[in-house]
UniProtKB/Swiss-Prot annotation:
Hemolymph. This is Hemocyanin A chain. SUPFAM superfamilies: Di-copper centre-containing domain, E set domains, Hemocyanin, N-terminal domain. InterPro entries: Di-copper_centre_dom_sf, Hemocyanin/hexamerin, Hemocyanin/hexamerin_mid_dom, Hemocyanin_C, Hemocyanin_C_sf, Hemocyanin_N, Hemocyanin_N_sf, Ig_E-set. Glycans are attached at residue 167. Residues 594-616 are annotated as: Disordered. Keywords: Copper, Disulfide bond, Glycoprotein, Metal-binding, Oxygen transport, Secreted, Transport. It comes from the Eukaryota. Disulfide bonds join 93-98, 483-502, 562-609. It comes from Panulirus interruptus. Hexamer of a number of different chains, of which A, B, and C have been identified.
């Protein structure tokens, strides 16, 4: 930062801004700024000379902004517009003083949900946010992640001044088969991955905000494809068939009772079982979505889309899936939003509103209208299976890979082994609910925690033995997938049937010296996953200690919270164990990374979340080499640089260290 503001100070400021978000700030320095700072006082502190802040101040002074203590949804057009006005202001700040002052000022004046969203995306996308770790959202807005019963207990603990730790149970009862896999969709780490991915790659993003989000449309496909495939793996582990796709003209079989409440706005609406889709006032008619879908199918059949100027763009080429992802999600990158609509975003709102489609009961938005809560609803995965099948139709239109396409000449994978057993178990995790309850003037905060059960696994290491028969060292890309062998009825799947259900476990780049070599890779280094984020309490302590001690703070290991949680890398499996195929494909790293600058140690979570502000580090299609049809699996088995072995995953009901 030009003013030399260190990471420790920035981290402390962000911590203070997000503390007790529904109450006036308790920090004297922020209070003083909020009362005395004039956002329009000196417009030289903004890159746009104050244009963005002028717009927001006009809305504020004309009393047009959403009031505080009201629900907020990103899918609500007006509310999103307001949050993005604040994002635009923070994004135009030249220095931290400007960022912090505006944040402190608008925190006291704007809707809390809009403020939190704008602050999070600003820290993620602004250069000023580098080095800051955003606290886990489940501690900032706990209502979105914790059921009402536990929140009520937290309130009574606060009132009676008794410390407490309360168990969060998964939604539903044993009468509901879907409850068997609730631990996946309701996992707070998985919720954070989903909401953060959509903050890293927002559908509202325009390049005028500062840079281009590389392969955003393709990543939209791949991240949701992987979430759906992982959900199907968990279903397989619980004796359930893969999730069915959604149909606009058939009933929605599974209802959903979220049993969670907004901080302000009442309970999340319930959707009963077996209802037909209804038109939603002010959103869309069911028929509109059917038309949108048929236009997308038509584009895939023709092999081209039509842009808003009437020109055709070929999609039977490597960038085709990117263009398709942009029009299906409908991000601002869509080539023709007028014609292709906004299938994904509209469908989220349609599903969210089925409990009150005509606004008769004035219910707040449903869980599907928030990325934080969407994966809790079984219909989320049905919706994404439906979209996934549209993408599959596109990828199936490409010719299968040939031996020459797949071969990495001179590179032989001789064997793949796992060092250690593949064991999964459930463990317990606690998070603080202090931000869920209001502070009274004379009531001290007491320690109140929620305790959740989370899927975890023992760490393991891949051992890949290989021979590099080329005349020197070669850069290689290692692509590791886990694939089902049988379906839920015990019928063996062909590779062509299984490939679409495979989950990505890792993708990394490594130099392989000439001759025989053994590559070892720990499961915790996976580029698909992220470690547990530090708690809000820990972030506050670390930042305060650093600021008070006058030293800096390096939290770079936690800067990205986009990624599958480390502990959920493996599917749960069954107590008696399940066998899966582990595929390792080693491809030519020089070709894969051609045109990318810098080293090849892309730590973090580049596989599904890219590299922040840079081009995606791998030129191959996401999912390569399993993303295209495989009519003859001998082609895959016939290349020396791809190997698969059978591995067994066992679920331990008791957790043994």
């Amino acid at each position: 930062d030009a003013l030399g503001t260190g990471n420790a100070q920035k981290q402390q400021d962000i911590n203070h801004l997000l503390d007790k978000i529904y109450e006036p700030t308790k920090y004297p320095d922020l209070k003083e700024i909020a009362e005395n700072f004039n956002p329009l006082g000196d417009t030289s502190i903004y890159n746009d000379h104050g244009a963005a802040v002028e717009t927001l101040m006009k809305e504020l002074n004309d009393h047009r902004l959403l009031e505080q203590r009201h629900w907020y949804s990103l899918f609500n057009t007006r509310q999103r517009k307001e949050a993005l006005m604040l994002f635009a202001v923070l994004n135009q700040c030249k220095e931290w003083y400007c960022f912090r002052s505006n944040a402190a000022y608008f925190r006291e004046r704007m809707n809390e949900g809009e403020f939190v969203y704008a602050l999070y995306v600003s820290v993620i996308h602004s250069k000023l946010g580098d080095g800051i770790v955003l606290p886990p959202l489940y501690q900032i807005t706990p209502h979105m992640f914790t059921n009402s019963e536990v929140i009520d207990k937290a309130y009574s603990a606060k009132m009676t001044q008794k410390q407490g730790t309360f168990n969060v149970s998964f939604t539903g009862t044993k009468k509901n088969r879907e409850q068997r896999v609730a631990y996946f969709g309701e996992d707070i780490g998985m919720n954070i991955h989903h909401v953060t991915w959509h903050m890293d790659f927002p559908f509202w993003w325009e390049d005028s905000y500062g840079y281009h989000l590389d392969r955003k449309g393709e990543l939209f496909f791949w991240v949701h494809h992987q979430l759906t495939a992982r959900f199907d793996f968990e279903r397989l582990s619980n004796w359930l068939d893969p999730v069915d796709e959604l149909h606009w003209d058939r009933i929605i079989r599974e209802g959903f009772a979220p049993l969670t409440s907004y901080k302000y706005g009442g309970e999340f609406p319930v959707r009963p079982d077996n209802i037909h889709f209804e038109d939603v006032d002010g959103v869309a008619h069911v028929h509109d979505l059917e038309i949108t879908e048929s236009r997308i199918h038509e584009a895939i059949d023709h092999g081209y889309i039509t842009d808003s100027d009437g020109h055709t763009i070929d999609i039977r080429q490597p960038k085709g899936i990117e263009l398709l992802g942009d029009i299906i999600e409908s991000s601002k990158y869509s080539s023709n939003v007028q014609y292709y609509g906004s299938l994904h975003n509209t469908a989220h709102v349609m599903l969210g509103r089925q409990g009150d489609p005509h606004g008769k009961f004035n219910l707040p938005p449903g869980v599907m209208e928030h990325f934080e809560t969407a994966t809790r609803d079984p219909s989320f995965f049905r919706l994404h299976k439906y979209m996934d099948n549209i993408f599959k139709k596109h990828t199936d239109s490409f010719p299968p890979y040939t031996h020459d396409n797949l071969e990495f000449s001179g590179m032989v994978v001789n064997g793949v082994a796992i060092d250690g057993e593949l064991i999964t178990f459930f463990d317990e995790f606690q998070y603080s609910l202090i931000n869920a309850v209001d502070s009274g003037e004379n009531i001290e905060d007491v320690e109140i925690n929620a305790r959740v059960h989370r899927l975890n696994h023992k760490e393991f290491t891949y051992k890949i033995t290989m021979s590099n028969n080329n005349d020197g060292e070669r850069l290689a890309t290692f692509r590791i997938f886990l694939c089902p062998i049988e379906d839920n009825n015990g019928i063996t799947l062909t590779l062509d049937e299984a490939r679409w259900f495979c989950i990505e476990l890792d993708k990394f780049f490594q130099k392989v010296p000439k001759g025989p070599e053994t590559i070892e890779r720990s499961s915790k280094d996976s580029s698909v996953t992220v470690p547990d984020m530090p708690s809000f309490q820990s972030l506050k302590e670390q930042a305060d200690n650093a600021v008070n001690g006058g030293h800096d703070l390096d939290l770079s290991a936690y800067e990205r919270s986009c990624g599958i949680p480390d502990r959920m890398l493996l599917p749960k499996s069954k107590p008696e164990g399940m066998e899966f195929n582990l595929y390792v494909a080693v491809t030519d790293g020089d070709k894969d990374t051609e045109g990318h600058n810098g080293g090849h140690d892309y730590g973090g979570t580049h596989a599904q979340c890219g590299v922040h502000g840079e081009a995606y580090p791998d030129n191959r299609p996401l999912g390569y080499p399993l993303e295209r049809r495989i009519p003859d699996e001998r082609v895959i088995d016939g290349v020396s640089n791809i190997k698969h072995v059978v591995v067994k995953i066992v679920h331990h009901l008791e957790h043994h260290d």
